Amino acid sequence: MAFKHKDIIGLQDLTREEIELLLSTAENLKEINSREIKKVPTLRGKTVVNLFYEASTRTRTSFEIAAKRLSADTINITASTSSVTKGETLSDTARNVLAMNPDIIVMRHAVSGAHHYLAKRVSCSVINAGDGAHEHPSQGLLDMLTMRQQFGKLEGLKVAIVGDITHSRVARSDIYGLTRMGANVFLAGPPTMMPPGIERLGNVTVCKDMREAVADADVVMMLRIQLERQGKTLLPTMKEYSRYFGLNQSVLKLAKKDAMVMHPGPINRGVELSSDVADGSQSHILKQVENGVAVRMSMLYHVSGGELPTE
């Protein structure tokens, strides 16, 4: 099937079939990353602009590597080195970038909805690399790919997501994607970090106790506390947070024996999870990073008009 969207703003906008297409393509493209020469001519002659208004290590680097492995030209623009520091608006930045005729803009922005605003004003494709606390679709896709590689399916899995749900765009993309693919999502976190009505996003159960969420889970996804998005301190101390919502070996034993431990990064060791869990045999955190390149290759491929041959 052909991917019918010009942009990828969020997993909320995609059907189950479209998510499946992006994941299947990522699995096929992943083989390129293990070749001696890690490059194919798929996007030769295309230009990808990485426009990042927020700090990023994994996502920006991963998108740049993904574009280059598809033979696209890449341009990296960060807020600190652009005219944004001189007061230029997003609209003016977009118009100036568009005048250079890029084919795809990959953007991260602190304001939720910024990508909808941009996509309506440019003719090229727009990929959301994270907008405020709204969505982070590439992270949601790579999380699902990592789970599917481990279990061979997403349907019926119990996925526990623990931490700062209110301020996490990763949590929202994971919820949209996982529930659409038939997984059962259980959330746990401090009451001050659990948004009201979150259950309406899909097949979601909110647990007051982390242990309830983790019990018999196939996947335990730990989230970072988003201090930079909090207007005020929502926790007495980090030590208290770790006591009630940190993942250690004792809590992990409540999950299934083959349960996966995941984290979108960056990790705060000793807060969200202990080092022995982060570095243990059940940790798939580095596998998530590895899968990120293939997933972002898939996203770039499909918004540029790529289509897999049908049987």
Swiss-Prot record:
Q: Which residues bind carbamoyl phosphate?
A: R58, T59, R108, H136, Q139, G265, P266
**Group of enzyme by EC:** transferase
| Keywords associated with the record | Pyrimidine biosynthesis, Transferase
Q: Which reaction does it catalyse?
A: carbamoyl phosphate + L-aspartate = N-carbamoyl-L-aspartate + phosphate + H(+)
An example of a Pfam family matching this protein is OTCace
* Any single GO BP term: 'de novo' UMP biosynthetic process
State which pathway it belongs to: Pyrimidine metabolism; UMP biosynthesis via de novo pathway; (S)-dihydroorotate from bicarbonate: step 2/3
Which family is annotated?
Belongs to the aspartate/ornithine carbamoyltransferase superfamily. ATCase family.
What functional role does this protein have?
Catalyzes the condensation of carbamoyl phosphate and aspartate to form carbamoyl aspartate and inorganic phosphate, the committed step in the de novo pyrimidine nucleotide biosynthesis pathway.
Q: What is this protein called?
A: Aspartate carbamoyltransferase catalytic subunit
- Please tell me the species this chain comes from: Geotalea daltonii (strain DSM 22248 / JCM 15807 / FRC-32)
Phylogenetic placement of the source organism: Bacteria, Pseudomonadati, Thermodesulfobacteriota, Desulfuromonadia, Geobacterales
Q: Which gene encodes it?
A: pyrB
